[in-house]
Amino acid sequence: MANFIKPYNDDPFVGHLATPITSSSLTRALLKNLPAYRFGLTPLLRGLEIGLAHGYFLIGPFAQLGPLRNSDIGLLAGFLSTIGLILILTLGLTIYGAAAFGQEKSNGSELQTKKSWDQFKGGFFVGACGSAGFAFICLSSIPTFALN
């Protein structure tokens, strides 16, 4: 193992962030398939896909661990809490977009303009609300997925 980890360019005084984990081909392949780094996605589709993932996985903790988890409306409360958090996250994306891209600059980069960021934000909101709604419908109507 001592021969495997060595200083970058054999100079111990040069900092480098490459590790056996971060520089492996498996890690790079996994990261390249994430919607944030995938080549060829429009900002709207990028936001939609990220929103779909977030809305779908956020409803579970709210429904199972929320204060109304043992009541009849626990799932509905979890769904509404998820929508509330999605609104807060979208508001955060709006504030970031206004601060970072307030003056219109045309860098040519994919998410570095106000218009692209607004498309990303809209896709995120629609995707997250849609997937949270889909998860709510699945959890409330399919007996196999019912929360107990």
From Swiss-Prot:
Top-rank taxon, per record: Eukaryota
Main localization of the protein described in the UniProt heading: plastid
UniProt KW keywords: Chloroplast, Membrane, Photosynthesis, Photosystem I, Plastid, Thylakoid, Transmembrane, Transmembrane helix
One Pfam match: PsaL
TM region(s), chain numbering: 48-68, 73-93, 122-142
Statement: the UniProt record of this protein carries the keyword Thylakoid: yes
GO terms under biological process: photosynthesis
Membrane topology: Multi-pass membrane protein
UniProt GO cellular component terms: chloroplast thylakoid membrane; photosystem I reaction center
InterPro entries registered for this protein in UniProt: PSI_PsaL, PSI_PsaL_sf, PSI_suXI
SUPFAM superfamilies: Photosystem I reaction center subunit XI, PsaL (SSF81568)
Keyword Transmembrane: yes
Subcellular location: Plastid, Chloroplast thylakoid membrane
Family membership noted in the UniProt record: Belongs to the PsaL family.
HAMAP family in UniProt: PSI_PsaL (MF_00447)
Protein name (Swiss-Prot/TrEMBL): Photosystem I reaction center subunit XI
Source lineage: Eukaryota, Sar, Stramenopiles, Ochrophyta, Bacillariophyta
Gene behind the chain: psaL
